[in-house]
Amino acid sequence: MDPILLDGKKLSEKIRNEIRREIEERKTKNLRIPKLATILVGNNPASETYVSMKIKACHGVGMGSEMIRLGEQTTTEELLSVIDKLNADPNVDGILLQHPSPSQIDERAAFDRISFRKDVDGVTTLSFGKLSMGVETYLPCTPYGIVLLLKEHGINVSGKNAVVVGRSPILGKPMAMLLTEMNATVTLCHSKTQNLPEIVRLADIVVGAVGKPEFIKADWISKGAVLLDAGYNPGNVGDIEISKAKNHSSFYTPVPGGVGPMTIAVLLLQTLYSSKEHFTPPVQ
């Protein structure tokens, strides 16, 4: 069987169309439309780009959007005050603090100040804890986007060996937990993992979440593996050597156009869920 490309751009557009239809229906009934508030602290050019993409995505589906721009010298206390105001605003359904913040900001304190009911980016400690216990919550956007890609293509991970390379709290760790919820047998690898190539060769499913260009080599990949590349590095390459590895995979995500578009689609989807006062459905 020829390898099948997991087209995140196509699925992302499908999700956005569904959101757009629901918002248009709300407008015809004179109901309040969902609104996402995004906080940008400082002048990081990459963050500026990401925030612009999110605002454009909101407008594209008819969703309300508010951007709060704070200066480079903003203190943690000033940021927390802004978050408190957004928490109290009944017209704001989701709050996103763009990462990274300037070094003087206690980013964990800021994330955890976001109301659990408005944590549509799945970044609070409470959301992470509920995810680990299998309790309904809002999920980190990139891992949940990967889950939706798997489901869209009917890829059953139950009983399969999955290897996640990278253990960041917003990607690697939650990805491992979601795959566990889907009954995969998961190995979570990191910088101290020994014999990494041998571990990856045993995997039916490989998730690249390490943030290093083409770190996972093609000759580490077993025939028929599912390749899920969540990395995006200079040169339009991910964390897996996809250009070579895809030839003996069963399914693979391209870079760009695979996992990336799903992240913003999930952010919009979870903002819509929040506006309806329910959480993201279980992944099983």
UniProtKB/Swiss-Prot annotation:
> Which superkingdom does the taxonomy of this entry point to?
Bacteria
Q: Which annotated residues bind NADP(+)?
A: 166-168, 191
Q: Which PROSITE patterns match?
A: THF_DHG_CYH_2
Q: Which GO terms describe its molecular function?
A: methenyltetrahydrofolate cyclohydrolase activity; methylenetetrahydrofolate dehydrogenase (NADP+) activity
- Would I find Ligase among this entry's keywords? no
- Keyword Amino-acid biosynthesis attached: yes
UniProt keyword annotations, A-Z: Amino-acid biosynthesis, Histidine biosynthesis, Hydrolase, Methionine biosynthesis, Multifunctional enzyme, NADP, One-carbon metabolism, Oxidoreductase, Purine biosynthesis
Which SUPFAM superfamilies has this protein been placed in? Aminoacid dehydrogenase-like, N-terminal domain, NAD(P)-binding Rossmann-fold domains
Assigned GO CC terms: cytosol
Q: Which InterPro entries match?
A: Aminoacid_DH-like_N_sf, NAD(P)-bd_dom_sf, THF_DH/CycHdrlase, THF_DH/CycHdrlase_cat_dom, THF_DH/CycHdrlase_CS, THF_DH/CycHdrlase_NAD-bd_dom
Identify its protein family: Belongs to the tetrahydrofolate dehydrogenase/cyclohydrolase family.
Q: What does this protein do?
A: Catalyzes the oxidation of 5,10-methylenetetrahydrofolate to 5,10-methenyltetrahydrofolate and then the hydrolysis of 5,10-methenyltetrahydrofolate to 10-formyltetrahydrofolate.
Subunit notes for this chain?
Answer: Homodimer.
What's the protein called, per UniProt? Answer: Bifunctional protein FolD
Native source organism of the sequence:
Leptospira borgpetersenii serovar Hardjo-bovis (strain JB197)
Upper classification of the organism: Bacteria, Pseudomonadati, Spirochaetota, Spirochaetia, Leptospirales
